[in-house]
């Protein structure tokens, strides 16, 4: 994959550039781009219009809706297109909260959710709602028993992410869904990281609302969806039009929706084959990185996404590691891309009990369809050298871990 710097020049590295930040965003697949292009040019009609090119756009949206529904085991009229995961999370949580506040004002979520969920819940607390933030174990796993104990008579919503964006831990979604159903509480899951990696059937898992975002599985940025089970009582987030069956106002992003539909279709059809490849690469990465002394794996050892590697190196700063990796043409992150500019320690690793003194030394490598065995070789060649270089420079590194 050809990658350029901000001046548009080729990145100079000993080998090709290696992109391992697919949990932040993914390149758009060629097939997805090809599906989108006609709706940026000749098929540009507004779907609300009654003339032919408007009808063509409307038909394209309906086809994309069917593809998204099929991927989730949902019905077509349960899929609503949005601008992405953040809007979907906001709509699900605020929409349920305000539509059902006559029944109660208590919401349950976890301490490791994406900030789109956490910040929305914090905002609702300012509006008079109460939120319980469930703790997680050292692997980032929510306890179903703790969830049961947190339920109150006035609990109206449980929002637990399907898989964590930083550490890749997959939650016991089926059990959580059963608990929610038993107690007649709405269950929302942020599945932004899970689509294309974990098979999802919303009916079998008792999911009432599910958020997804196209750019996380080789679809376009700026387009997502919210699954809302038929019969769920929810208020709109946006007002000003009758689009999306009067629930989500605003002229539809037809090219984005078409791309989302195609990306969803491809990603879900290829889960088995993709996971086989990704698991081999992931496990090689983990095995190789853990050979570096004083390195720890974050997240569940087995119940994790096939593309996720998150490790902590003692005695180094993750920001310095990323800068040196960037100079070598390796692109990774320390955690959530939506919070990458913050110097605050990861709220996810903090919740998992990672000691404060080493929490800043984390590295997330998230694999994608384009990654190869050679990419893994390159990372395993470069990372140990950089870690050692940084340890040699750090006054915190004990003598036995220096090579000066």
UniProtKB/Swiss-Prot annotation:
Enzyme class per UniProt: transferase
Binding residues annotated for pyridoxal 5'-phosphate, in chain numbering: 85-86, 165, 193, 213-215, 251
GO cellular component: a single term: cytoplasm
Subcellular location: Cytoplasm
EC identifiers of the protein: 2.8.1.7
Record pathway: Cofactor biosynthesis; iron-sulfur cluster biosynthesis
Keyword annotations of the record: 2Fe-2S, Cytoplasm, Iron, Iron-sulfur, Metal-binding, Pyridoxal phosphate, Transferase
One of the protein's GO biological processes: [2Fe-2S] cluster assembly
Residues reported to bind [2Fe-2S] cluster: 338
UniProt-recorded Gene Ontology molecular function terms: 2 iron, 2 sulfur cluster binding; cysteine desulfurase activity; metal ion binding; pyridoxal phosphate binding
Family matches, as InterPro entries: Aminotrans_V_dom, Cys_deSase_IscS, Cys_deSase_NifS_bac/arc, Cysteine_dSase, PyrdxlP-dep_Trfase, PyrdxlP-dep_Trfase_major, PyrdxlP-dep_Trfase_small
UniProt cofactor(s): pyridoxal 5'-phosphate
Catalytic activity as recorded in UniProt: (sulfur carrier)-H + L-cysteine = (sulfur carrier)-SH + L-alanine
Coiled coil: none
Function: Master enzyme that delivers sulfur to a number of partners involved in Fe-S cluster assembly, tRNA modification or cofactor biosynthesis. Catalyzes the removal of elemental sulfur atoms from cysteine to produce alanine. Functions as a sulfur delivery protein for Fe-S cluster synthesis onto IscU, an Fe-S scaffold assembly protein, as well as other S acceptor proteins.
Subunit description: Homodimer. Forms a heterotetramer with IscU, interacts with other sulfur acceptors.
Alphabetical list of HAMAP family matching this protein: Cys_desulf_IscS (MF_00331)
Miscellaneous comment as given in the Swiss-Prot or TrEMBL entry: In Archaea the pyridoxal phosphate cofactor is not covalently bound to Lys but ligated by other amino acids.
Stated family: Belongs to the class-V pyridoxal-phosphate-dependent aminotransferase family. NifS/IscS subfamily.
UniProt name for this protein: Cysteine desulfurase IscS
Organism field: Methanosarcina thermophila
